[in-house]
Amino acid sequence: METRYIEISLDTAKRLYEQGGEFRDIALTAFKEQELIGDRLPKTWDEYCAKHGEVGDRIKASLNTAYMTINKYTFSDYKQAQAHIAKMKLHLLRDDYRNGWKPDWKDGKLGKYVIESSEGECYVAKYIHISSFLAFQDEKTANEFLTNFRELIEEAGDLI
């Protein structure tokens, strides 16, 4: 089999990366994942870790260690432990999506867009005074977060 080498621009590699599968693999042979993600918001936990480089690697390693060291004395069952780790991931991801914004729950004029769950369904709602863990500065950001991390939100369960 003959091997050939191609040149690929960063913009082209970013488009390939977004397509996933083998295209993503091709993009990753030419550029680091951190370069391909750039400043955009992560769509997965792994992208969050890649975006944050060495710090992300340390966070990922710490959470993996937590998974392995959880025992019956810490949580009543493994599902509870997974829910707590999911919430820790959501906390870090949420702060990335907020980009420095923090909700002022005393401000009765400015609405906050929150992700909540009722009867097993997750959705975005607008609140003014009711505090919520997954609160965002605008509806678009809240919906994007919900789309990208619905499974993780469901895994965190009633901790949200």
Q: Language-model segments: which ranges?
A:
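Structural boundary micro-motifs
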Residues: 1-160
